[in-house]
Amino acid sequence: MKYKDLTHITNFIKEQTARIEVISVNKYFNSIFAGKKCKVQAVNNVSFQINRGDKFGIIGTSGCGKTTLARIVLGLIKPDSGIVNKYGKIGFVAQDPYASLSPNMTVREIVREPLRFLSKINKSKEIELVDNALNAVHLNPLKYADRLPSKLSGGERQRVSIARAIVIRPDFLVMDEPTSMLDEAVKKEIFDVIRVIVEKEQCSLLMITHDIAMSANMCDKLLVMENGCIVEAGDKEQVFNNQQHPFTKKLILAATDIEGYWEKIGITKAETKE
């Protein structure tokens, strides 16, 4: 009896089930206050779900728990309570392109590294995947593959970080402040690279940032964090135009109280009722 190729069915099921579930997650760290040991809660009862195709942004001021939450989602640290379920492959781009790349590895070796966690890939396929990832971030493999990170600019290093994240063809791309250490011109270039990759690969995006403009330009849905808690969640138009929490109102007002800002982020400002 001959069986039909069911690859298309398998891929369809995968696309429908790829998701990240964060359920009632809490995380504490040891600290010292007034000379006494104490526990500080970095993440406070956080729950959300990212489905296939979602573009999520987690925004908030520095120290609100965003990066800790991202590290929990990635499995780099364990929550003290709560559950994180991950269905699908995850690529990660760290905040610091200078610290996140091994100084003694070439660009090709760095980008190739995640492939060793997948099932066996032959040499020619490995080269193809690495070259495709480098081309996707506009780094010519012939020019850059054998360079060390010390021979790259900050923008080029972050492109290598992105190439390393996408070489496995991830279902989810998690990015922690991916442009915070780059100047404005390079930041825009990286935005454009990320946007094209997310659309082309049809992967979901989880972006951790305090850059309100970036979250508006890159994400469809926003979670607002304050002191480890999610204080507001919704579509970006809702969060920008109809805030329910005082902290969100303060955060958005501070960011948008600049001439031309609404045009910059591509969102129509709601009319203020007299």
Regions found by a protein language model. Name each.
Residues M1-T10, H138, N241-E274:
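C-terminal boundary and immediately downstream tail of ABC-type ATPase nucleotide-binding domains
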Residues L148-L152, E156:
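Conserved ABC ATPase signature
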Residues L173-D176:
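Catalytic Walker B motif of ABC-type/P-loop ATPase nucleotide-binding domains
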Residues S215-N217:
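A short, surface-exposed alpha-helical micro-motif characterized by mixed small hydrophobic
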